[in-house]
Amino acid sequence: MEVALIYASMTGNTEEIAKIISDQVEKLALDVKTFHIEFDDIMALDLKDYDAILFGTYTWGDGDLPFEVEDFYDDLADEDLTGKVVGLFGSCDSYYPSYGAAIETMAQQFKAVGADVVEPLLKIELAPGPEDTERIQQFTQIFVTKVKK
């Protein structure tokens, strides 16, 4: 089974989370193809080619989607991902009033096109640290278990 792992990262925090998740998913016997949304060739219409999806983003400003995610978000509305398992994650900053709002926005869009979104969403304060290891492992295990059903 092949998983598309797509992420947006400005400071490297979400990229670091993506690498940890990718390593763990591969250890649990799924293949992962990783895409940086800004630099790699991945579009919403490509998602149908994968068995499951992991999507990571940071939140811009007071709760906005990052610029590089906006077109993907809009294009996602035209896709049918009924039954596809999707795990959402990202780095967040508690300095801002809308903690991880972009992750929630993407989750709603994936749900609107029929995806089976893994709960809870994985929100990490800034860069992942040792205190986040267990939460990331739990998120990854829930995701892989749903995919293998």
Feature locations, PLM:
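FMN-binding flavodoxin-like domain, especially the glycine-rich phosphate-binding loop
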Residues: 13-16, 23-24, 28, 35, ...
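Residues in the short beta-alpha loop(s) of Rossmann-like NAD(P)-binding domains
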Residues: 9, 38
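Short acidic active-site motifs
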Residues: 39-43
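Short hydrophobic segments within beta-strands
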Residues: 6-8, 89
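Extreme N-terminal starter segment of soluble prokaryotic enzymes
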Residues: 1-4
